A protein has these predicted regions:
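Extreme N-terminal starter segment of soluble prokaryotic enzymes
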Residues: 1-4
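A short alpha-helix capping/helix-coil boundary motif
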Residues: 12, 117-118
Length: 118
């Protein structure tokens, strides 16, 4: 299996990560199908080419639907989940055991890094 190494001295958000994966050739439908294995309801993704500050890439917009079917783009006013919340969600998902293990390890590393700078 190929290994992807990130060098993000300024960090990377989840939507930036999804856009980068699509820009590298990951099929957006396959990506969304895997994410659908998580127990979250009423959302969809949009992937669009974008250029900012002379840097081109794929922008991922995450749209969460409310109970009336309306949607809004992901913004900074959202709820942040703790590592424990994420761990419970991943463990309770329909993802494969290997993906669960890898995802929890990645989020643990992220939690440790975030804890050291905040």
């Amino acid at each position: 299996m190929p290994t992807l190494v990130y060098n993000c001295p300024s960090g990377i958000s989840g939507d930036m990560n999804l856009g980068a994966m699509v820009a590298l050739g990951v099929d957006p439908k396959a990506l969304e199908a895997e994410l659908r294995k998580l127990p979250y309801e009423a959302w969809h993704l949009h992937f669009d080419p974008d250029t900012r500050g002379g840097i081109s890439g794929i922008r991922c917009s995450v749209h969460a639907h409310d109970h009336h079917g309306k949607h809004s783009s992901h913004g900074h006013g959202h709820h942040h989940r703790t590592f424990t919340d994420i761990q419970k969600t991943v463990k309770g998902s329909e993802l494969s055991d290997r993906v669960k293990t890898d995802a929890i390890a990645c989020f643990h590393a992220l939690a440790v890094a975030e804890g050291s700078v905040h």
